[in-house]
């Protein structure tokens, strides 16, 4: 039996710029209920590994009796393996949810203290092969940008003098590894029953041929709603956290600067393309999926400076949403705690997860203050952060009913509604 956790919250919409080479491949408008409705299971930050049990660690992360493995260069991937071990049952529960016809993972397949290895990636990929429905995946910062950190194995060698991480933790090399393993065919999802989507590798602007590298950026239509994914990693959009391991020193390197600038530009063009497609097809809403929680003051200081490089994405999203005029939902992972609200409206209602496995409570702070926009705000926007990293494992069931037009709340907007599900 599944436990459904109630929530309470708000929503958004966008702009139109028809980019060259708009591909129409694989964007059939799925109707899984015969009446236009469909539902997705959305989650992230799993399978995760808890931090070592210390006085400072959250009490739910490594409970007494957990099989925590010390961080040792000569040992297996460090961390608590319980979520990996629980993943088959979780996948089975999602498969048995008769309402769900598509799965979305918003990134982070291991913790910020786990090694970045081909073997670990393969283990997760093998587990995911049991999803019967299509699986759309967006890589998180722990899979690539943070691989250079020593706590993820960056620059760390074992007793044989070998680097424990793939490519010594080189971020670009690890993103290439993730692409080769999880995106072997552009425009095709994971899962046993794959479906076609449109990838930026297929529908890139010919004026910017390097955009074809971003095979992980996709869009697709589902029940008259356009979904678009963008590779925006958590932390600082990979701009402020220096690549300090492997071949990189203690200052920002040219490869790091180039990577962030090129990806940011490609993402913004992709977002414009997606909204143009949504307007062209008469979509009733747009759902934006990215890993980063761009409003999260994560304790890395100075906090506002650390998230300042998300400004181009938020400004573009706000402008496109206002122009679109219909509901726009952004779904993020990254910060681990379920959150529902509209950070593009000052003092908007907001709810946040107050403890593992519990319902929500009003937010203590206003995310609008970190990226303030427009005197009148963007009322047709809503942002949802899905739960992750801790037990119990859960997913958010996102239901689309194109016949509905819900007022903005903590658990619905436009044709979209959602609920937290603990299998």
Q: What positions do the PLM features span?
A:
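Bacterial N-terminal signal peptides
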Residues: 7-16
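Sec/Tat signal peptide C-region and signal peptidase I cleavage site
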Residues: 18-23
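N-terminal active-site segment of His-dependent metallophosphoesterases
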Residues: 24-119
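Short, solvent-exposed loop/turn elements at domain surfaces
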Residues: 38-40, 48-54, 229, 236-240, ...
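Active-site glycine-centered loops adjacent to acidic/histidine catalytic or metal-binding residues
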Residues: 45, 107-108, 140-141, 291, ...
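Extended active-site neighborhood of metal-dependent phosphoesterases/phosphodiesterases
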Residues: 61, 115-263, 337-340, 345-401
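His/acidic metal-ligating clusters that form di-metal
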Residues: 87-102, 221, 228, 242-345
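A short C-terminal boundary segment appended to hydrolase-like catalytic domains
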Residues: 382, 390-423
